[in-house]
């Protein structure tokens, strides 16, 4: 086995090379990563290596041999598959690692994200929904010193940036959202999809699933005439009544 192949072969299902393939298949079946769209990157905390899904591979068929591996310090590729090129998302993934101290980043072409980007302006907003409690607030508990989640009564805000012809051209707007929304764990790209990050792949997956649930709910609320961020008890003021 070559030194490059050692990086991606493991019997551990939670090894980044195995986990990326497992999650890409799952996201394909969720209709989030079809037609080779989307991608995942995971930082291995044991080696400080970035594992990156390639460009142009069908996500449900991805294998560990398809993955790129990069040294987090030198940003040099330690492993490059012959059949594929690096994901166009790579500069965006690196920005999340370097500026947000992410441990993993998920990029999907979720239809819910795309529709929300057409309905909302500069930011997606939803409030007073239980699932919001799965999203980090960006604050730290003064007693336990642990990260705090948003509460039921909080408003989740996710910035929306404009799409570009090429994904690497999104980098300037991504850096701006880091500055304008320092507590966010996601950014929606209009007519494109969403990027979600977290301190670990488990957290990033939870955040991504919760946000997609909330976006789907917001779309249904919008169809009923209910603003997704309306106050508790105000729903019926906006509700579109069915014709008798």
Swiss-Prot record:
Catalytic activity as recorded in UniProt: 5-(methylsulfanyl)-D-ribulose 1-phosphate = 5-methylsulfanyl-2,3-dioxopentyl phosphate + H2O
Cofactor note: Binds 1 zinc ion per subunit.
Cellular component GO terms, alphabetical: cytoplasm
Residues that bind substrate: 89
Active site positions, chain numbering: 130
GO terms, biological process: L-methionine salvage from methylthioadenosine
Gene3D superfamilies (UniProt xref): Class II aldolase/adducin N-terminal domain
UniProt enzyme class: lyase
Annotated protein name in UniProt: Methylthioribulose-1-phosphate dehydratase
Organism of origin: Saccharomyces cerevisiae (strain RM11-1a) (Baker's yeast)
Gene name as annotated: MDE1
